[in-house]
Amino acid sequence: MVDRSSSKSRYGVYGRARKELNNGYSVCIFPEKDYLDESVLLNPFKQGAFKLAIEHQLPILPMAFYDCKRKMPWYTYYGRPGSLRVESFEPIYTLGLEEKDIPVVQEIARQKIYNALTSDPKKATEKALKLWEGVMQRQNPSS
């Protein structure tokens, strides 16, 4: 886990991920910025995961986790056990890409995930966002 408020922690995690990749292992990185805000469907992405992929010329496999906001919300009183639906998409190949290409690759990955979340037939994320709005209204009734 990374302490996002600490540059030392962020750099340490980045270094460990680089080491694992150098040793031939795969890594799973959740690149979302400020993920603790339950009112946002999908935040913009940080660059680190994409920089690592391009640096090592490795493909990126975007994945949508449909039920996270409902099953594992950050306002822990309302979490519950259960299964998560996960969808993986076609890889984004980085062979021949350079650091200057990071913003484009970042946005392609984010859009694939965002489009999947907004077209979920079970509307799990939308339901979770509405639940969160209700929690906030009960907490701050004058808002």
Task: Please give the residue ranges for each predicted region.
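Catalytic core of membrane glycerolipid acyltransferases/transacylases, capturing the structured
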Residues: 1-8
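Non-catalytic C-terminal accessory region of glycerolipid acyltransferases
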Residues: 11-143
